[in-house]
Swiss-Prot record:
Gene3D superfamilies: 3.40.50.20, ATP-grasp fold, A domain, ATP-grasp fold, B domain
Highest taxon of the lineage: Bacteria
Catalytic reaction annotation: N(1)-(5-phospho-beta-D-ribosyl)glycinamide + formate + ATP = N(2)-formyl-N(1)-(5-phospho-beta-D-ribosyl)glycinamide + ADP + phosphate + H(+)
Domain ATP-grasp: 119-308
Binding site for ATP: R114, K155, S160, S161, G162, K163, G164, Q165, E195, G196, F197, V198, E203
InterPro entries, alphabetized: ATP-grasp, ATP-grasp_carboxylate-amine, ATP_grasp_subdomain_1, PreATP-grasp_dom_sf, PurT, PurT/PurK_preATP-grasp, PurT_C, Rudment_hybrid_motif
Protein name: Formate-dependent phosphoribosylglycinamide formyltransferase
GO-annotated biological processes: 'de novo' IMP biosynthetic process
MF (Gene Ontology): ATP binding; magnesium ion binding; phosphoribosylglycinamide formyltransferase 2 activity; phosphoribosylglycinamide formyltransferase activity
Enzyme class: ligase
Source organism (scientific name): Nitratidesulfovibrio vulgaris (strain ATCC 29579 / DSM 644 / CCUG 34227 / NCIMB 8303 / VKM B-1760 / Hildenborough) (Desulfovibrio vulgaris)
Gene name tied to this protein: purT
Record carries keyword Lipoprotein: no
Keyword ATP-binding part of the UniProt annotation: yes
Source species taxonomy: Bacteria, Pseudomonadati, Thermodesulfobacteriota, Desulfovibrionia, Desulfovibrionales
Length: 393
């Protein structure tokens, strides 16, 4: 893109965000720094990205007709999905009609559930993955466990943030894992994936940027998961040189198959110099929030540059860095944060509070960010900062 218009005028360069959570908010802010007009869409009002966007719409993004009506009215330069739960059939139609979907409508479709992307990675591209089977009924599920063996991981094919996910260690866990998967998926009861457990040393997110100038890899991000959801991340994760080369080759293959420009969060398991593909998101990744402090350009800045066709120069690491999630649990429609002063008292710390308007159950409300002399020091500092913040519900 050689030129950018002025927001709220006939020359505006407009992007439309589908999903307006914390990741969408950061994308919106980076786009607005470049003078881009931002329209935010989500299923609930006052979502984080809506609080900073030029305009917003509240609609179920699984309602294809409603989604089409908004897109046809807004006529965006590009449509930027931030979540998986979207009427991807409608996106495919709109792309065929000339609308641009980031990175592509096919990528949005394949990654909206675990089956599409696993079949692409393992069966079409031949990438190493854990053994797996898909099941639609309880009978198929039990047969899948028999084939894959114990221990194994059971997940709804459509879910996020660990919802519906269980580790099945013994036969006593089989019934409860099926029941949880049937209630925890985005589409309610439905199909599951049964994955063999990989005995890995660590897992990483390899942020991969496909842009007009080629492909750029961020340094690998290590992360800690609890109940299937991200709790901490750090960068750079030390890696064997052979493993890093394999990881980059896998990331290049899967993102190349998905196509388009933008940032992709490629999740991989690593043991020694062995690497297994796990999942990919064709958008900024929650573990990549650490790049708000770790790099000269965050994953959000990189995403916006890539989708606008702007240059992505050499990335610079600011030093060992870490993030730690700030959680709240309970019910509230007006959360308040305490201890912000204490959290920011240490040198080289920062907070990113998401501005989520409600809490019902457990919800990620922000992250603490820190630089340190090494990864352990950065992680400890980020944990201290996060621990200083309490959320009043």
């Amino acid at each position: 893109m050689a030129s950018i218009g002025t927001p709220l005028t006939p020359t505006a360069t407009r992007i439309l965000l589908l999903g307006s959570g914390e990741l969408g908010r950061e994308v919106a802010l980076e786009a607005m720094r470049l003078g881009v007009e931002v329209v935010a869409v989500d299923r609930y009002p006052n979502a984080p990205a809506m609080q900073v966007a030029h305009r917003s719409h509240v609609v179920s993004m699984l309602d294809g007709a409603a989604l089409r009506a908004i897109i046809e009215a807004e006529k965006p330069y590009c449509i930027v999905p931030e979540i998986e739960a979207i009427a991807t059939g409608t996106l495919l139609e709109l792309e065929q009609e000339g609308y641009r979907v980031v990175p592509t409508a096919r990528a949005a479709r394949l990654t909206m559930d675990r089956e599409g992307i696993r079949r692409l990675a393992a069966e079409e591209l031949g990438l190493p993955t854990s053994p797996y089977r898909f099941a639609s009924t309880e009978e198929e599920y039990r047969a899948a466990i028999e084939t894959v063996g114990l221990p194994c991981v059971v997940k709804p094919v459509m879910s996020s943030s660990g919802k519906g996910q269980s580790l099945v260690r013994t036969p006593a866990d089989i019934d409860s894992a099926w029941a949880y998967a049937q209630t925890g998926g985005r589409a309610g009861a439905g199909r599951v994936i049964v994955e063999g457990f990989v005995d890995f040393d660590y897992e990483i997110t390899l942020l991969t940027v496909r842009h007009a100038g080629g492909v750029t890899f961020c340094d690998p991000i290590g992360h800690l998961q609890k109940d299937g959801d991200y709790r901490e991340s750090w960068q750079p994760q030390p890696m064997d040189a052979v493993a890093l080369e394999k990881a980059r080759a896998m990331a290049d293959a899967v993102t190349g198959a998905l196509g388009g420009w933008g940032i992709f969060g490629v999740e991989l398991f690593v043991r020694g110099d062995e690497v297994w593909f796990s999942e990919v998101s064709p958008r900024p990744h929650d573990t990549g929030l650490v790049t708000l402090i770790s790099q000269n350009m965050s994953e959000f800045a990189l995403h916006v540059r890539a989708i606008l066709g702007l240059p992505v120069p050499l990335l610079r690491q600011n030093g060992p860095a870490a993030s730690c999630v700030i959680l709240a649990e309970g019910d509230s429609e007006a959360p308040r944060f305490h201890g912000v002063d204490a959290a920011l008292a240490e040198q080289d710390t920062a907070l990113c509070l998401f501005g989520k308007p409600e809490v019902h159950g457990r919800r990620r409300m922000g992250v603490a960010l820190a630089l340190g002399d090494d990864i352990d020091a950065a992680r400890a500092k980020a944990r201290r900062a996060a621990g200083s913040v309490t959320v009043e519900l």
